[in-house]
Amino acid sequence: MLMAKPDVPSSILPRSSSILPNSIETLDENESIEAQVNNVQSLALSSPNRDRSDDDDNNNNHDSVSIPPPIYDGYSSSSSDESQSVPSPPINLDHDDDECQIPIRNTSQALDDIDDDIWGDDDLPETRRPWTPNVSPGFGSDDDDDNDDDNSKNEPRKSLFYGFRQEPEPVTGVGAGLWNLGNSCFLNSVFQCFTHTVPLIESLLSFRYEVPCHCGNEFFCVIRAIRYHIEAALRPERCPIAPYFFFDNLNYFSPDFQRYQQEDAHEFLQAFLEKLEICGSDRTSFRGDITSQDVFSGRLISGLRCCNCDYVSETYEKSVGLSLEIEDVDTLGSALESFTRVEKLDEQLTCDNCNEKVSKEKQLLLDKLPLVATFHLKRFKNNGLYMEKIYKHVKIPLEIDLQPYMRNIQENEVSTKYHLYALVEHFGYSVAYGHYSSYVRSAPKIWHHFDDSKVTRIDEDMVLSQDSYILFYAREGTRWFSSVYEEMQPLVEASLLNSSPKSVLDSSTNGECLSEISYENGDKASKPCDSAGVCNQHVKTKEDFVSLSNDDVFLSAESSSGEESPMGELLDPLDPDDSYSPCTEKESDSCLAIERATIRDDFFPLLLDQNQESSTSSPKLQERTFEMQLLQMEETTKSQEPWKQPLSSISNIADSMEAEFVYGDLMKKPSPRARELLDQAISTNGSPPKKLKTT
């Protein structure tokens, strides 16, 4: 056990400066926290399609902060509404009616409570605007009281020129929102921070995907999946996307993770970064100098000093983010000071120098800094009965210098200054209940709030007043996401134009933007890898696909890209048809290129050899290859349809039954015994497979 003693020295390791950090200036230090609290709609976990409870509206005070809600027996709890006057209304990410009015595919009956209202509130009457609580669906509920008089009290204040009120500007320059698939807010909040991490994007651009990858799982590649996710999030359509890749593979990251169950965002962050590090362990797979390990991985040095002979032993520990105690601190700097403080060990240990069993002192210092420093503020502690949340505001700076907490100066004069660009916040009173959302800083003075599928512009002072849970700091000199976003947009649009018209199936969408852009492909158990690292063995039926084309053939042959660009690797990974097509669902890209054609409701696979991939490098060769494969498919289809062949060619049928079919009336319904024997003969000679099975 580590205990801090007042009489221990300030440091037992050589340091370039004192352990006491320089005072870090924060914004609005004297400003009241109560005046900066955002609209926290509810701390109880409830379904998001409930209307606002009107009983609580009468008691709301716009200038006060409500205390955490009491814990009730069972899952159901009443809504506890926290609100205040906001300087300016947030800018909602709304979509036009002709752009995103496509039904959302319901993937499970457990998602019945997911909010079906994806439109903005500006199109509805002022007195009937719906309210969605800031919680994840899955447990509990809010009261369902509708009262027009009470709802009218919550209307925004109308200006004197109400008829000429200016409409809010659309949100641009950031990624799209993410649908809540059922208590998946912990995943959404972390991935929004990943999507806007510039060093991570740069490392993904330089990654060369190999088959098989180094993830240790042939069915799921973390790097390929996160690349695909970021590409989909930066599409210009700005429709929210559904992260089925990761949601359906939560068990891959940890056996404790279950779908539709609220998980801890920090635990998921650590599990994801661990898998990302394993997948990117081969540095030769990265063409650039930045690897996925360099983005988040740092190193600590641990020093043990013998209190008898003053001998100091040093060991190095790999670190992916720091977990900081906040119970006795009020700023991020003081939390780091407490983390690097010298502590005296209660247990006596044997000294390697004097060979005596003596007391020792321990100190942790930063030795190597990553490109992105993550800090986890420990807001949950075990009180003996359950995990209790620490409701305490910790002041976080926009900029921080980590030099005072390091052992020595970084090599090659690497900067030790970092700027805040993202954070994750938790609402609620327990680690198992509540809601997660994230805040992203895309430019020095531009912040956005990502609350699942909703993306709004938010003031910087409002962000700094939140009770943050996970902090993301980028090293000084790192480009802002807004500049990277502008560079990637032309390449994103080019990838849309270069998408093959035969890469999709017939659909009734007619090119409209889906309200739910999904990049999930079928079931996830025992299936080969698809283009984004997601397993896919059982082929979907025709109606499950979404398309922009009226073609009847699906082509997903792999081909290599002849040119390389700084940003093109993310947008055009490995093959042109593998790029994400807006408002479409990706088809699998297994270790063997699979050609599929639709005849009626069945799929006929044609497996191509790997050496044939180069033949599809040019458009003409690709079209010629496609025609040849279509002819081959037709011949294969005829050979696999024994019911269209003379019945005399069918073997293993009893003579009596054969005579009944050959010479009898074919329109006559056969006997059950004859039907059974015929089915056996057809299965022996071959029949169209209902599902594609790959061993």
From Swiss-Prot:
Domain of life: Eukaryota
EC id: 3.4.19.12
Comp. bias regions, Low complexity: 9-20, 61-86, 556-571
Protein name, entry field: Ubiquitin carboxyl-terminal hydrolase 20
Molecular function terms from GO: cysteine-type deubiquitinase activity
Keyword Ribonucleoprotein appears in the UniProt entry: no
Biased composition (Acidic residues): 112-124
Pfam families: UCH (PF00443)
Catalytic reaction list: Thiol-dependent hydrolysis of ester, thioester, amide, peptide and isopeptide bonds formed by the C-terminal Gly of ubiquitin (a 76-residue protein attached to proteins as an intracellular targeting signal)
Keyword rRNA processing recorded: no
Role noted for this protein: Recognizes and hydrolyzes the peptide bond at the C-terminal Gly of ubiquitin. Involved in the processing of poly-ubiquitin precursors as well as that of ubiquitinated proteins.
Keywords on record: Hydrolase, Protease, Thiol protease, Ubl conjugation pathway
Occurrences of domain USP (ranges): 176-476
Gene name of the record: UBP20
Active-site residues, as the UniProt record annotates them: C185 (nucleophile), H435 (proton acceptor)
Database matches in SUPFAM superfamilies: Cysteine proteinases (SSF54001)
